[in-house]
């Protein structure tokens, strides 16, 4: 069942999808990270997911 409430969508986005993923080791990092917490690589990408409307 899809979530249609915009407040709940924002909560889901911040809790689940607003992260960065290391391309080298796959570790999840905070959205403000500049380097990986596990392997210290600077090769980070935003986590894939849906876009907020």
Swiss-Prot record:
<comment type="similarity">
    <text>Belongs to the eukaryotic ribosomal protein eL40 family.</text>
</comment>
<keyword id="KW-0689">Ribosomal protein</keyword>
<dbReference type="InterPro" id="IPR038587">
    <property type="entry name" value="Ribosomal_eL40_sf"/>
</dbReference>
<protein>
    <recommendedName>
        <fullName>Large ribosomal subunit protein eL40</fullName>
    </recommendedName>
</protein>
<keyword id="KW-0687">Ribonucleoprotein</keyword>
<dbReference type="GO" id="GO:1990904">
    <property type="term" value="C:ribonucleoprotein complex"/>
</dbReference>
<dbReference type="InterPro" id="IPR011332">
    <property type="entry name" value="Ribosomal_zn-bd"/>
</dbReference>
<dbReference type="GO" id="GO:0003735">
    <property type="term" value="F:structural constituent of ribosome"/>
</dbReference>
<dbReference type="InterPro" id="IPR023657">
    <property type="entry name" value="Ribosomal_eL40_arc"/>
</dbReference>
<dbReference type="Pfam" id="PF01020">
    <property type="entry name" value="Ribosomal_L40e"/>
</dbReference>
<dbReference type="GO" id="GO:0005840">
    <property type="term" value="C:ribosome"/>
</dbReference>
<dbReference type="InterPro" id="IPR001975">
    <property type="entry name" value="Ribosomal_eL40_dom"/>
</dbReference>
<dbReference type="GO" id="GO:0006412">
    <property type="term" value="P:translation"/>
</dbReference>
């Amino acid at each position: 069942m899809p979530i249609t409430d915009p407040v709940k969508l924002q909560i889901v986005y911040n809790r689940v999808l607003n992260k960065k993923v290391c391309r080298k080791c796959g570790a999840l990092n905070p959205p403000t990270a500049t380097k990986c917490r596990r392997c210290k690589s600077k090769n980070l990408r935003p986590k894939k997911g849906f876009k907020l409307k």
